[in-house]
Regions:
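Targeting-peptide/extracellular-domain and disordered-appendage signature
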Residues: 2, 6, 25-121, 126-178
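Bacterial N-terminal signal peptides
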Residues: 10-20
Length: 178
């Protein structure tokens, strides 16, 4: 015959056994890598340290840059509620692009520098681009913590410079800054 004390001990023992079974069945899964892997490129130029941290989107057989329907043109980012039409390029001409994937690309410099002859103060900036067929706008924006270009605000631009694209004869599968 079991006593209350024996019954309590038996219940406790069963609880321990069942807890052990439950704990051992919960397996730790390794984190799944992002589709667009994060990368950082850093360079010392003179005494200035410059780095770009970005996520590397892949082409995956898609058209990267090109024309979009005229009703979604302008300097509104794709991320502002516009849905990419089927078979449309990932980054349309004339739209703000995060210059990577996932979070906005981060540009960091430890000294005041000149970019295309224009001053940029030392600091961290989100790095965006507005691609065009013949000319691109490079944007250094003071909001360095934004996701993509969802909340891009042109009034926070520290610097905008224009540049001419130089197209490579062969393409890379992943975005790469060097």
């Amino acid at each position: 015959m079991f006593s209350f004390k024996g019954s309590l001990l038996l219940s406790f023992a069963i609880l321990l056994v069942l807890s052990g079974i439950q704990i051992s069945s919960a397996q730790v899964r390794p984190p799944v890598p992002r589709a667009s892997q994060k990368a950082t490129v850093a360079q010392t130029i003179g005494t200035s340290e410059v780095s770009i941290t970005y996520s590397r989107p892949a082409v995956k057989g898609r058209t990267v840059y090109g024309d979009w329907p005229s009703d979604v043109k302008g300097e509104a980012t794709l991320d502002n509620q516009n849905t990419r039409p089927a078979n449309a390029p990932l980054v349309p001409w004339g739209h703000v692009w995060r210059a990577g994937a996932n979070e906005a690309t981060l540009f960091t410099v430890n000294d005041d520098v000149l970019i295309n002859g224009q001053p940029l103060a030392a600091g961290k900036y989100s790095f965006h681009m507005i691609p065009g067929k013949d000319e691109w706008t490079i944007i250094f924006n003071k909001d360095d913590g934004q996701w993509g270009s969802f909340s891009y605000d042109a009034s926070k631009d520290a610097l905008r410079v224009k540049t001419k694209p130089q197209w490579a004869s062969d393409s890379e599968e992943l975005l790469s800054y060097s």
